[in-house]
């Protein structure tokens, strides 16, 4: 798949990592950096244990905990057993602790000052480098593309594949460029810019593509701002987002713990300077936006594409002609509790969340602190939280006095973790609570059942907390105070970070009391399972192989929706498992079941709750972008558990599409008009469809051919038809992998060592964790 002539940045990085390419064009890519966390790794490590396989490159692997850990004070942290109260969360963390011990994987646990959100600690430590391939079982791995890395999220099956082979099977994506002309206006951030872009192209605008962000405004961004941009490329449907590395990149990386040094640094920079798109390279898709047009931007609905400038009003569905879009808008407004034509600045909020892998770096905290300095949160705001992205960010912020400014303003100052971004931990919203959030997704139920999330920049979220409603940051009154002066700096000097003490000056105040409703939500949002009776490492293994997919005949269920995200397919509370099975109940849980005020849960009239669709084997979806959102492989696991083995839609989220094949499911892309005219009527009538994979045809229950030829990549078809194990097939190419590694040691020696270079820190917090868990 070598590109002749002019190449894009993506072309260059992709081609530099090809280990082997088959006749169909499918490539085996070498992975330079693999980040691991507690939610998407248990089943992967169990697969290794079952097969007796080691982790091939522990030096290219770095693990941490972030998704479901509490963010309350760790001043008296002793161990995971006593600190994490929720049994299923505790089990996942303990399972990771055992796995990193068993497989000798470098690990930054809760007792380590360097622990934090996985996409913050990678760059922070210099583990992320330009021109590398970076993967993680998390969709926001695209964050690392800010360094000119090819970084993308993978599912659990691919996590296992990378652990075992240090490679991943990939097909080349299309090239997309988003060019930002001119500079951003004062007060406008990269969060405003990326929300505006997603609002323009939609959440499916980048499907099948790797986006390169270019232009003057991009070049002028700090590294932390660039990371926020690439972080949300996935919300535009892209496989990854990339920015050309430059002097800003090199300055950020130089001197970080895992970055090259000496002659290796010079060798690396010489190579990194070649990582730029050639002038005459051709992009498949190009979009241009003007930097001067960007205003402070927030979301109003239940998708990141529902983004508008702060001086706009809530849209009116009556002005939309497309019936699917109009219906989706009406549903979003009902869920969000908003009336059409309401000014965004008139919308009142209940809570504020400043954090997440999008906006929890030191630059973000400085910007928010500058806003709240000298103010107090509005009396109508129930809770305002600031959650640093890592222990080191927290240290640096405390050294600058930011924690005191936040606390004086009424904000809670928390420990590092994903926190309220996805509500897998105790930090959640109560039903119908409205939050000004710096996170990356505003899906239904993302921050708690019936939660209402509005995305925005840290400064905008902080200002909303002070005023009690959304405000235009350009009109906000900044105050001087007697608190330590906050300088909103634009550098990323790590000297303070290196010198700061980890210990707190005093015991942190307890968290604000949750309302009765929120307490109830905290308990009841997590389905009861028997996982708490298991011990770490006892997860059932993956199937030894997949059942061959030849012909599938059965009931087809209709679903007339667009942008069905993975949070809707399987809500976050069902991710707290170390198994691949038992997820049938969680499939479309919030659509299939209703929770009443008395706590009772009853079934709805959702299609899969009705006959004959309770036994559906195929799902026929009319709208595009099915499976958009997170990398959770739990989505295809839940579909498979229910009995659905084929999904037909106009388009799919890239990660979901890939995860489906890994689990023996067949996702079929067809034109929307073909689905609506030929397949949807049969599904609506409770009829059957026959999916013939060898022939690549679709027929009705009586054998009449409806689709004479659907497309499926030859390599994927071969694996499905034969029920083949990807890892076993890849290990047959050991010679090619070994040859690539020999070349890598010679030509890219600055990548060697990786996480094995991570030093132990003598002043990390004491812990009763077994020494071997941190023994690198």
From Swiss-Prot:
One Pfam match: Aconitase
The catalysed reaction is:
(2R,3S)-3-isopropylmalate = (2S)-2-isopropylmalate
Enzyme Commission no: 4.2.1.33
Q: Where is the composition biased (Polar residues)?
A: 527-538
Q: Where are the transmembrane segments?
A: none
Leader sequence residues: none
Alphabetically, the GO molecular function entries are:
3-isopropylmalate dehydratase activity; 4 iron, 4 sulfur cluster binding; metal ion binding
The record's listing under Gene3D superfamilies reads: Aconitase, domain 3, Aconitase, domain 4
Reply yes or no: does the keyword Iron-sulfur apply: yes
Taxonomically, the superkingdom here is: Eukaryota
Indicate whether Transferase appears among the record's keywords: no
Q: Which InterPro entries does its entry note?
A: 3-IsopropMal_deHydase_lsu, 3-IsopropMal_deHydase_ssu, 3-IsopropMal_deHydtase_ssu/lsu, Acnase/IPM_dHydase_lsu_aba_1/3, Acoase/IPM_deHydtase_lsu_aba, Aconitase/3IPM_dehydase_swvl, Aconitase_4Fe-4S_BS, Aconitase_4Fe-4S_dom
Q: Where is the composition biased (Basic and acidic residues)?
A: 482-493
A single Gene Ontology CC annotation of this entry is:
3-isopropylmalate dehydratase complex
| One Gene Ontology term from the biological process aspect of the record | L-leucine biosynthetic process
The record's remark on the cofactor is: Binds 1 [4Fe-4S] cluster per subunit.
Region described as Disordered: 482-518, 525-544
Pathway per the UniProt entry: Amino-acid biosynthesis; L-leucine biosynthesis; L-leucine from 3-methyl-2-oxobutanoate: step 2/4
So which cofactors does this thing need?
A: [4Fe-4S] cluster
Which UniProt keywords are given for this protein, alphabetically ordered? 4Fe-4S, Amino-acid biosynthesis, Branched-chain amino acid biosynthesis, Iron, Iron-sulfur, Leucine biosynthesis, Lyase, Metal-binding
Quote the subunit structure annotation. Answer: Monomer.
Its biological purpose is as follows: Catalyzes the isomerization between 2-isopropylmalate and 3-isopropylmalate, via the formation of 2-isopropylmaleate.
Task: Quote the PANTHER family the UniProt record gives.
Answer: 3-ISOPROPYLMALATE DEHYDRATASE, HOMOACONITASE, MITOCHONDRIAL-RELATED
Q: Which family does it belong to?
A: Belongs to the aconitase/IPM isomerase family.
| The name this protein goes by in its record | 3-isopropylmalate dehydratase
Species source reads: Eremothecium gossypii (strain ATCC 10895 / CBS 109.51 / FGSC 9923 / NRRL Y-1056) (Yeast)
């Amino acid at each position: 798949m070598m590109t002749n002539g002019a190449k894009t940045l993506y072309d260059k990085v992709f081609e530099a990592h090809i280990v082997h390419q088959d006749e169909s064009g499918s490539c085996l890519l070498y992975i330079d950096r693999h980040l691991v966390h507690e939610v998407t790794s248990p089943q992967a490590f169990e697969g290794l244990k079952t097969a007796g396989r080691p982790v091939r490159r522990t030096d290219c692997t770095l693990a941490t905990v972030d998704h479901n850990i509490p963010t309350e004070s760790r001043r008296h942290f002793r161990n995971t057993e006593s600190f994490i109260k929720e049994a299923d969360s505790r089990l996942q963390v303990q399972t990771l602790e055992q796995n990193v011990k068993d497989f000798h994987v470098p690990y930054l646990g809760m007792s380590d000052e360097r622990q934090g959100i996985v996409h913050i600690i990678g760059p922070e430590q210099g583990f992320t480098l330009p021109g590398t391939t970076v993967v993680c079982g998390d969709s926001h791995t695209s964050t690392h593309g800010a360094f000119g890395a090819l970084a993308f999220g993978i599912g659990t099956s691919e996590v296992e594949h990378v652990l075992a082979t240090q490679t991943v099977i990939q097909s080349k994506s299309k090239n997309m460029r988003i060019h930002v002309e001119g500079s951003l206006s004062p007060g406008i951030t990269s969060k405003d810019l990326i929300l505006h872009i997603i609002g323009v192209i939609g959440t499916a605008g980048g499907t099948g593509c790797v986006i390169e962000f270019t232009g003057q405004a991009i070049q002028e961004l700090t590294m932390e701002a660039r990371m926020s941009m690439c972080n949300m490329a996935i919300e535009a449907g892209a496989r990854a987002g990339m920015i050309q590395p430059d002097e800003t990149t090199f300055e950020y990386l130089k001197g970080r713990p895992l970055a090259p040094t000496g002659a290796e640094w010079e060798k690396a920079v010489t190579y990194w300077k070649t990582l730029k798109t050639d002038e005459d390279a051709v992009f498949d898709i190009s979009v241009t936006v003007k930097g001067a047009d960007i205003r402070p931007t927030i979301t109003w609905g239940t998708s990141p594409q529902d983004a508008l400038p702060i001086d706009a009003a809530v849209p009116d569905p009556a002005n939309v002609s497309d019936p699917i879009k109009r219906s989706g808008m009406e549903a979003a407004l009902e869920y969000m509790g908003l009336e059409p034509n309401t000014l965004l600045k008139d919308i009142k909020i209940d809570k504020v969340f400043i954090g997440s892998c999008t906006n929890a770096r030191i630059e973000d905290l400085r910007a928010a602190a500058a806003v709240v300095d000298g103010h107090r949160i509005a009396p109508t705001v129930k809770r305002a939280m600031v959650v640093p992205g890592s222990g080191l960010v927290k240290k640096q912020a405390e050294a600058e006095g930011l924690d005191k400014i936040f606390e004086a303003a009424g904000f809670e100052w928390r420990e590092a973790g994903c926190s309220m971004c996805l509500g897998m931990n105790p930090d959640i919203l109560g039903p119908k609570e409205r939050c000004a959030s710096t996170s990356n997704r505003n899906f239904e139920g993302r921050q708690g059942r019936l939660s209402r999330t509005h995305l925005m920049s840290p400064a905008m979220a902080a200002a909303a907390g002070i005023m009690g409603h959304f405000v235009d940051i350009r009109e906000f009154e900044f105050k001087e105070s007697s608190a330590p002066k906050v300088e909103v700096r634009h550098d990323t000097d790590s000297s303070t970070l290196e010198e700061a003490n980890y210990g707190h000056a005093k015991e942190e105040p307890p968290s604000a009391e949750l309302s009765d409703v929120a307490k109830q939500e905290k308990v009841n949002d997590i389905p009861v399972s028997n996982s708490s009776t298991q011990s770490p490492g006892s997860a059932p293994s993956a199937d030894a192989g997949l059942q061959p997919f030849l012909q599938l005949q059965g009931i087809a269920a209709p679903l007339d929706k667009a942008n069905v995200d993975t949070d809707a397919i399987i809500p976050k509370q069902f991710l707290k498992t170390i198994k691949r099975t038992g997820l049938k109940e969680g499939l479309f849980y919030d659509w299939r079941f209703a929770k009443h005020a008395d706590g009772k849960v009853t079934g709805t009239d959702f299609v899969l709750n009705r006959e004959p669709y309770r036994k559906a084997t195929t799902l026929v979806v009319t709208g595009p972008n099915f499976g958009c959102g997170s990398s959770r492989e739990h989505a295809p696991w839940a579909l498979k558990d229910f009995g659905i083995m084929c999904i037909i839609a106009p388009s799919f989220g890239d990660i979901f599409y890939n995860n489906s094949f890994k689990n023996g499911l067949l996702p079929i892309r067809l034109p929307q008009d073909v689905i609506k005219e030929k397949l949807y009527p049969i599904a609506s009538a409770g009829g059957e469809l026959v999916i013939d994979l060898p022939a690549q045809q679709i027929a009705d229950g009586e054998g009449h051919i409806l689709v004479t030829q659907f497309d499926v990549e030859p390599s994927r078809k071969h694996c499905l038809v034969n029920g083949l194990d990807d890892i076993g097939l890849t290990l047959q190419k050991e010679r090619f992998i070994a040859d690539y590694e020999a070349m890598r040691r010679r030509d890219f020696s600055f990548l060697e060592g990786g996480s094995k270079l991570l030093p132990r820190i003598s002043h990390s917090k004491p812990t009763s964790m077994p020494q071997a868990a941190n023994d690198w």
